[in-house]
Amino acid sequence: MKKVLLPLAALVLSATASNAMAANGTVKFTGEIKQSTCQVTSDTQNKEVYLGTYPTSAFPTVGSKSASKAFQISLEKCDAGDYSLRFDGNTVAGNPDLLSVSNVGGTGAAATGVGIEITDNNGKPFAIGDGSNINDDVAKVTIAADGKATFNLQARYRSFDSNVTAGLANATSPFTIEYK
């Protein structure tokens, strides 16, 4: 009986001994929080884009669009890397890619049934607000060796209701440049 217990005891002790010899280590996390030197050029920092005057008949159905008006936001003195653009502002309920229009800056009633859509040069729309762009590639530029880059953009009216009413159709949209 002692011959059976002795090997069994040795087996149990060897199994527990390997657990007692566990190794310890350390994980080192490194990184840097950096103040970006990137600047929006003075001529594109506070832009006014005139979208034009259109009759209500130019928006006969939901999704009708006006002509697009081109504009740019240019960056300078940037570190190398990818930068993204985020627009903020009040949006049309159920349409996260449309800025709500109002009569801000004017007198009279605001138009209804339309919003302002901001797109890239290919017509891909930006989501307004939370940074989750409908088309993520829309919002990125890579800084050139000279520290400069330009977002080429367009804006237009787009109807979200089949009953568009006349009035002022103005909106403002603060924007943020983010280092990615």
From Swiss-Prot:
Range of residues in the leader sequence: 1-22
GO BP field: cell adhesion involved in single-species biofilm formation
Chief localisation class: other
One Gene Ontology term, aspect cellular component: pilus
InterPro entries on file: Adhesion_dom_fimbrial, Adhesion_dom_fimbrial_sf, Adhesion_dom_sf, Bact_Fimbrial_Adh_Pro
Key words, A-Z: Disulfide bond, Fimbrium, Signal
Disulfide-linked positions: C38-C78
Location(s), subcellular: Fimbrium
Family, as annotated: Belongs to the fimbrial protein family.
Reported function: Fimbriae (also called pili), polar filaments radiating from the surface of the bacterium to a length of 0.5-1.5 micrometers and numbering 100-300 per cell, enable bacteria to colonize the epithelium of specific host organs.
UniProt protein name: Type-1 fimbrial protein subunit
